[in-house]
Amino acid sequence: MPQSADPVHVVGGGLAGSEAAWQIATRGVPVVLHEMRPQRTTDAHLTDGLAELVCSNSFRSDDPEGNAVGVLHAEMRQAGSLILTAADQNQVPAGGALAVDRDGFSRAVTKALEDHPLIEIRREELTTLPPAEWDKVILATGPLTSPALAEAVLSLTGETALAFFDAIAPIVHFDSIDMGKAWFQSRYDKPGPGGTGADYINCPLDEAQYHAFVDALIAGEKAPMRDFEAKTPYFDGCLPIEVMAERGRETLRFGPMKPVGLTNPHNPTVKAYAIVQLRQDNKLGTLYNMVGFQTKLRHGEQARVFRTIPGLENAEFARLGGLHRNTYLNSPRLLDGTLRLKADPRLRFAGQITGCEGYVESAAVGLMAGRFAAAERRGEALVPPPLTTAHGALLAHITGGHVEAEEAGAPRSFQPMNINFGLFPPLEEAPRGEPGKRLRGAEKTLAKKKAMAARALAHMAAWLDTPARAA
């Protein structure tokens, strides 16, 4: 593949920026990757590594047939994703999910980018709009975009940014968990990548313990919000556990503490009223994170409240939970169909700042932005992935998913979105069962998902194989 002399500048070394830089460089186009850490850090980052995971260590389901994020995984592998390659190399057992050793994952991404001959990494903060001589730029500054740069971008658009909160779950040392009360089991004994079907630690609560826990959560002292945070809405996919508890006493046991698909081997005849799950957080198996337990409780309150959970009475925390404010653009109004800023098309955006939600989605948007930028630099036509693919469905949501609804007289605010089958266009033909058998209920739903997944992977492969043509 012939090389292009002029670089594309990628600002931000998170999941999206790292993936974008990789996709550009592998297409023979030089890249300058700008990362402000360690010169300037954030409240959520702990290292200066590229693609650091600041929240969960899970990339969610790896099922390429029945789960939309699993389809996105598969498409990214088809496209030579650096993020998925590093995740596969650093996976830890997690039932049906793809979870990673966060430090090993970040090191693998950092090394791959440092070793690529067409990638230059500059450790510096960008506080203003990129200089005019940077004619191709991807801004992948993420949910923790520095205030100065956010203001500079907003001054160009005339719009205000939307913001939401992401909360961070606590991490517990394995050897402090009482396995005489807790046990290993995946829900419904389902194995996943590198897993055994017994990949989660489960802590059971009876009805009285559950209600006492809910009371303690609600009464627990929360960290105060700064003035600018008070009006910021939470994203439903990452609600603090105490906010869920405040929404209803039974909310948690139908959410992250649901007891279904699990049997306590210490007391197999008694069904738990609720169950707390912990997922392996590092390859050594020495750390486990509390699934769905992101929180804004003060640190002292967290230790006190979470130690009321059976099995965690003597828990030692490697990290306590926290909360950080995320910022994202009103992308349907501000970005075109290839993620360029309408007000200044030399600027392209990628990752969570575009309004996608989740590690995998952020990296996928980075993958598309990188391919678009490389094609543009090489004078090739910009062809978005088909709407029938997970990438195409995600892109359509970000760049146009809400504008049509508003124009039709049904306004609603643009919100962060995980990939899901609801973003895919309907099947041209409904799946059929065996001759003489009509699909119904769950069987019909699963057949539709499998058909959508098969269509997505076939169409993604065809898109990737399409020869480039001149713009």
From Swiss-Prot:
Its main location: cytoplasm. GO terms for biological process: tRNA methylation; tRNA wobble uridine modification. It comes from the Bacteria. It is an enzyme of class 2 (transferase). GO terms for cellular component: cytosol. FAD binds at G12, G13, G14, L15, A16, G17. Its EC number is 2.1.1.74. GO terms for molecular function: flavin adenine dinucleotide binding; tRNA (uracil(54)-C5)-methyltransferase activity, 5,10-methylenetetrahydrofolate-dependent. Its cofactor is FAD. Signal peptide: none annotated. It holds the Pfam family GIDA. InterPro entries: FAD/NAD-bd_sf, MnmG-rel, MnmG-rel_CS, MnmG_N, TrmFO. Belongs to the MnmG family. TrmFO subfamily. Catalyzes the folate-dependent formation of 5-methyl-uridine at position 54 (M-5-U54) in all tRNAs. This is Methylenetetrahydrofolate--tRNA-(uracil-5-)-methyltransferase TrmFO. The lineage of its organism: Bacteria, Pseudomonadati, Pseudomonadota, Alphaproteobacteria, Hyphomicrobiales. The gene is trmFO.
